[in-house]
Amino acid sequence: GSSGGLITFGRT
């Protein structure tokens, strides 16, 4: 992903 958080970083 892009920008979402630390835990959801990469899952968009």
Curated annotation (Swiss-Prot):
Keywords of this entry: Amidation, Neuropeptide, Secreted
UniProt keyword Secreted present: yes
Pfam families attached to this UniProt entry: Periviscerokin (PF08259)
GO CC annotation terms, alphabetical: extracellular region
Main location class: secreted
Keyword ATP-binding: no
Threonine amide sites (modified residues): T12
GO BP, sorted A to Z: neuropeptide signaling pathway
Localization per Swiss-Prot or TrEMBL: Secreted
Tissue specificity annotation: Expressed in abdominal perisympathetic organs and abdominal ganglia.
Family: Belongs to the periviscerokinin family.
Role noted for this protein: Mediates visceral muscle contractile activity (myotropic activity).
Protein name, as recorded: Periviscerokinin-1
Natural source organism: Derocalymma versicolor (Cockroach)
